[in-house]
Regions:
Chain C
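ABC ATPase nucleotide-binding domains
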Residues: 81, 91, 96-235
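The feature captures the beta-strand-to-loop junction immediately N-terminal to the Walker
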Residues: 40-42
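Conserved coupling/switch loops of ABC nucleotide-binding domains, chiefly the family-specific signature
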Residues: 61-64, 215
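Non-catalytic connector elements of ABC transporters
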Residues: 255-372
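Conserved ABC transporter NBD signature motif
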Residues: 63-71
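Helix-to-loop junction immediately C-terminal to a conserved catalytic motif
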Residues: 55
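Pre-Walker A (P-loop) beta-loop-beta motif of ABC nucleotide-binding domains
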Residues: 27-38, 92
Length: 288, 264, 372
């Protein structure tokens, strides 16, 4: 009977080995080789890693990535939670809101980029025209500031609905009696949120935060189509840098090393956040 | 009441850029480039004709739907027993394994492009549905196990025990009792899995050439070839968006129950 | 510490849609100051809806709620000073027991020194002293329910406390202890209490007066004794008591100049008062008698016409008694009777039953008939 759990995990493990483990081994292998076209690969140890860590462009991309992911989390999580609380609990409004919220999620990522590109381009977009009318000169292709907040707005547009859906699920699971009790106990709306909604949503919020964190690190197609990483390299994020190294560059070993460093960073940050959130609010007692 | 306005405001924010693209897709290029109009003054279907007359697009659609569906099947079949094991039994290393599964979702697709290409070339799977459907398990399987585990943990273990006492065999218990209980959870999982597979571009592009090319890739390639023809681009965007909208509309009730069962 | 009155309450869910359901219709009820009351009825009879209307969580479609004569129908729950304990323990998980008890007071702006004093008092009463600084998530449903109760009665201005089937999550063995503490708290603070349940035993042990609802209507509001002895209709007769009252369909015949109840070939005498109230034109009549009032005799009573021959069909041990079911001979009417636990009787034995006239209730069209 001791083997039973593993029997149940077998299909998943098989699938993961094809889709993740074997490729990961390959990446690790490459990362320690120097692979130049036309020559035999030779072992170069940690050389690739050192070269990347010393690369200014890598550090800049990493810095931008961390700031971007941070901004994504502090805007999308509260916004999504607030929207989930504003969702109707029953009636025809539920289906309608779910459909509208689901649309951005089901648009291919490059199309998301296209939508925002035609929306914000100075020659054909309506957004620059609208800003112009208010007296603000909006220039996505030359202003770093405009490019940045537009990429962020696009990410909020694209991914906040996922946060809303996850939080909405969590809110629906909170028994109505908790809110009734809070009413009877004369709790203000803020206290109701603080002592009823928030503690009951902790598990769900961990999922939302981790999912957004991991996925914001992977952002690639949308800014690629929208800004092409510019102006300059001001919207070039870690994933863009990595794929440039992995496909665009000649040096496949270096690309592999970049991927591993990237992978390591995401796991580290996710792990820290996971542990912190798990212990948050735990001071007074156990889980649920 | 103001809560409602907050939601409505956001829904408008979602719709405005989409409207702008739809609006543009019905305009000739002369109108797009020369003046800013809030609705098409010179209404035309030419952009759509150009796209729909191409065999590529139709094939892209079908390929996308088949690949995403295959991925949903693979992921569900593997994730259900795994999630069951995590939710029901304590075994050596379960916490570590669970987190290790999760880390796979963090893997950058960019990092896996080349190894995937090599692996699937060796397996002779390049440019088949199998390649993409299997590759997408990389990020979908962890998510599915994670969500299903949540749903299953919400169902008391006593239900399992009662069923076995009542003389159900394990398969009969799964089919007649357990699966019906977590049906909404499966629906939510399948929806998210389908969604992430449907919209993924990088791996799909690496692993397909022509025969199995999904719509996202068709879109990028036709862009590269045709230059920036804004009207056609917008129409292509609209076309790539429609299946998603239809799917959400069709499963909205399932989603409403799944999400209101509230275990994600 | 107040009198609660609901007047002409009617409540309709989903009004104007296809799902329209009338949950409560035409309910009038006055709970006197400082009394313990129960609201009893089968599931879905509108008990919980009425409770929520009193606490202000629901607005009634029609009617008024009055507290000490003041109309509070339009007031939110926070302004009514009514506490409510729910079916499962509603606890603020992120605070310890002390924080939970202090929550309603802090929300009301009570100074900390006074809060501490109140908590001490409540903790003494409910025996929560040892766990004041524990996290509720480790305490189990019984203690949590006590904490929820404590949170209800901690406010000095609590005028009434409502219980919505609070024992659902509590293990049977612990129900007694919990109920004792609840009862003590109610007495100590002289709080008007309303206890909703579908368990008559719970209702009758907790409350001085019990209101019984059925299909959204209030059927009878009375002391336990009256409910048992003078049910207003067959529903109450059957519902109260375990097993409930025997309800025997009967016809009316004229005998010795007065109307008599007739079951098959057997004529049954009822009290004189009721005989005078009967009308020979009535149909749909029942006589009702408690199983404990039926006299059972094995020996043939010879010429005593008050005895009716019957055959035992079933004997069950219930509590400290035996309940036997017997069919009246030449009819298909079954009667339950209570006999002592050591009474020697077997199935298929012929016996004689007597229904003492003074213990018989008479129902016409389901309603009790009283002396004119």
């Amino acid at each position: 009977m001791k083997q039973r759990p593993w029997l149940f995990l077998l299909p998943a493990l098989l699938l993961v080995s094809i889709s993740a483990f074997i490729p990961l081994i390959t990446v690790m292998n490459y990362s320690q080789l120097t692979l130049l076209p036309g020559t035999e690969p030779y072992f170069s140890g940690l050389e690739n890693f050192v070269a990347i860590l010393e690369d200014e462009a890598f550090r800049a991309a990493l810095g931008r990535q961390v700031i971007f992911s941070f901004l994504v989390l502090i805007t999308e999580i509260p916004l999504g939670l607030g929207l989930a609380m504003a969702m109707p609990k029953e009636g025809p409004g539920v289906g309608l809101s779910l459909v509208l919220l689901g649309i951005p999620l089901l648009i291919p990522w490059n199309v998301v980029g296209i939508i925002w590109r035609v929306f914000t381009r100075s020659d054909i977009g309506v957004l620059p025209a609208a800003f112009d009318w208010f007296g603000y000169s909006y220039e996505i292709s030359s202003s770093t500031f405009d490019a940045w907040w537009t990429v962020l707005a696009m990410d909020i547009w694209h991914w906040t609905p996922l946060v809303v859906l996850i939080c909405y699920a969590g809110i629906q699971a909170i028994p109505e009696e908790y809110y009734m009790a809070a009413k009877i106990d004369r709790a203000s709306p803020w206290k109701t949120f603080r002592y009823v909604t928030l503690p009951n949503l902790r598990g769900v919020l961990i999922i939302a935060v981790l999912l957004r964190l991991m996925d914001s690190f992977k952002i690639y197609a949308e800014p690629f189509v929208l800004t092409g990483g510019g102006p300059g390299s001001s919207t070039t994020f870690l994933s863009t840098y990595t794929s440039r190294m992995a496909i665009g560059g000649f040096q496949m070993g270096r690309g592999a090393a970049t991927s591993l460093i990237y992978f390591f960073i995401v796991i580290l940050i996710s792990f820290v956040i996971y542990i912190v959130m798990l212990n948050l609010g735990q001071g007074a007692g156990g889980d649920q | 009441m103001n809560k409602k306005y907050y939601l409505i405001l956001f829904l408008v924010f979602i719709l405005v850029p989409i409207y702008w693209m739809v609006n543009m897709s019905f305009k000739p290029n002369s109108e797009i480039l020369n003046r800013l109009t809030l609705y098409p003054h010179e209404f035309t279907l030419a952009n759509y004709k150009e796209i729909l007359s191409s065999e590529f697009w139709r094939a892209g659609y079908i390929n996308s739907i088949l690949m995403a569906s295959m991925n949903v099947v693979f992921v569900t079949i593997a994730a259900l027993p795994a999630a069951y094991a995590f939710s029901r039994w304590d075994f050596r290393g379960d916490k570590h394994l669970f987190f290790w599964f999760l880390t796979n979702r963090m893997a950058p697709p960019a990092a896996f492009m080349v190894p995937f290409f090599i692996l699937y070339s060796n397996l002779n799977l390049i440019d088949t549905y199998w390649a993409v459907a299997l590759a997408h398990c990389l990020f979908n399987l962890p998510l599915a196990i994670w969500i299903l585990e949540g749903f299953m943990s919400g169902i008391p273990k006593e239900i399992d025990e009662m069923a076995f006492i009542d003389g159900h065999s394990f398969p009969s218990f799964c089919w007649n009792i357990f699966l019906p209980l977590i049906k909404p959870g499966i629906a939510v999982t399948a929806f998210l899995t389908f969604m992430f597979s449907w919209v993924e571009l990088l791996l799909a592009r690496t692993l397909t050439n022509e025969a199995a090319q999904p719509i996202t890739v068709t879109l990028t390639r036709s862009l590269g070839a045709g230059g920036w023809d804004w009207g056609v681009l917008a129409a292509a965007g609209v076309i790539a968006m429609i299946p998603g909208a239809i799917i959400v509309y069709l499963v909205r009730d399932l989603l409403a129950t799944g999400f209101s069962m509230g275990r994600v | 510490m107040a009198e609660i009155e609901v007047r002409d309450i009617r409540h309709v869910y989903d009004a104007g849609t296809a799902d329209e359901t009338v949950a409560i219709d035409d309910v009038d009820l006055t709970l006197q100051d400082g009394t313990a009351n129960a609201l009893l009825g089968p599931s879905g009879c509108g008990k919980t809806t009425l409770l929520q209307i009193i606490s202000g969580l629901l607005q009634p479609t029609e009617g008024q709620v009055l507290i000490d004569g003041e109309d509070v129908t339009a007031k939110p729950p926070a302004e009514r000073d009514i506490a409510q304990v729910f079916q499962f323990p509603v606890i603020y998980d992120s605070m310890d027991v002390y924080g939970n008890l202090a929550f309603p007071l802090r929300n009301g702006g009570v100074p900390e020194a006074e809060i501490e004093e109140r908590i001490q008092k409540i903790a003494d009463l409910l025996e929560l002293n040892d766990i004041l600084h524990s996290s509720p998530s480790n305490l189990g449903p019984e203690l949590n329910q006590l904490v929820a109760l404590g949170r209800g009665i901690i406010r000095a201005d609590t005028s009434a406390i409502l219980f919505d089937e609070p024992m659902t999550d509590v293990e049977p063995a612990r129900k007694l202890t919990i109920r004792r503490r609840v009862k003590e708290a109610q007495k100590e603070f002289d709080i008007t209490a309303l206890y909703v349940t579908h368990d008559q035993h719970e209702a009758l042990t907790f409350a001085e007066k019990v209101a019984i609802m059925r299909d959204g209507r209030l059927v009878q509001y009375d002391t336990g004794e009256n409910l048992y002895e003078n049910p207003v209709n067959t529903f109450i007769g059957h519902f109260i008591g375990s097993p409930g009252m025997n309800l025997l369909g009967c016809g009316l015949t004229k005998e010795n100049g007065a109307p008599h109840a007739q079951i098959g070939p057997h004529a049954i005498s009822v009290s004189d008062d009721i005989h005078h109230a009967m009308d020979l034109s009535w149909t749909d009549c029942h006589i009702g008698i408690r199983p404990s009032s039926v006299t059972v005799q094995v020996a043939d009573p010879q010429d005593d016409t008050h005895y009716i021959p019957a055959t035992v069909s079933q004997v069950e041990m219930v509590g400290g008694y035996q309940i036997l079911t017997a069919r009246l001979d030449d009819t298909d009417v079954e009667v339950k009777a209570r006999v002592a636990h050591d009474y020697m009787i077997d199935e298929d034995v012929s016996i004689w039953l007597r229904f003492p006239p003074d213990t018989i209730q008479f129902f016409h069209e389901e309603e009790a008939v009283h002396a004119p």
